[in-house]
C-alpha cells in the first residue's frame, strides 16, 4: 500500500490593495495615541508621566500588532496574506506606534517643563541607587559612577529614544511569531 500523497496548497497569496498600509496606519496610530494619552493622563494626575507606569499603555502595542495581523488574514480570505504582508503589517504597526509614542514623550517633556523632567531624573536615580544597594558586589565602582552620571545627564532625547525602543521591542516581540503563525 502506497503512502497517500498530499496535494500542494495552490491558493494564491493575495492581499486586498492597500490593506497592509491601512491596517498598520489604523492600529499603529491608535496604539501610539493611547500611549501618549496615558502619559499625559499620568502627568495631569500628579504621577510621573515618564516613569514605569507608562508600561501599562505600552502593553497595548503588542495587542494592536496582533489585531492588525488578524484582520489582515481575515481580509485576505479565502486567500492567504503571505509572510511578507503579515510581518509587514505587524512591523509597520509597531514602528508607527513607537514613533508616535516617542514624539509624545518629547511633547510632554516640553509641555510639562523642566521640573517634571528633573523629577523623573530624581526618581530614576533613586531606582538605580536602590538596585545598587540590593546587590553591591555585582557592579564595579566605576560602572556605578558611570550609571549615576548617565542618569544625572539624561536628556529629553534620551527619554524619547528609550520610549521608542521600549514600544518597538514590545511590538516586535509578538509581531514576528504571530506574523509567521497567521501567514497561512
Feature annotation, model-predicted:
Residues 2-75:
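Transmembrane alpha-helical insertion/packing segments
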Residues 22, 26, 30, 88-97:
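Alpha-helical transmembrane segments of multi-pass membrane proteins
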Residues 34-38, 42, 61-65, 97-101, ...:
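Alpha-helical transmembrane segments of multipass membrane proteins
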Residues 71-85:
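Membrane-helix interface/capping segments
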Residues 74, 182-184:
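Membrane-interface capping segments at transmembrane-helix boundaries
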Residues 103-134:
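Functional transmembrane-helix hotspots
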Residues 128-155:
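Short membrane-interface loop/juxtamembrane segments of multi-pass integral membrane proteins
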Residues 145-172:
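Individual transmembrane alpha-helix segments
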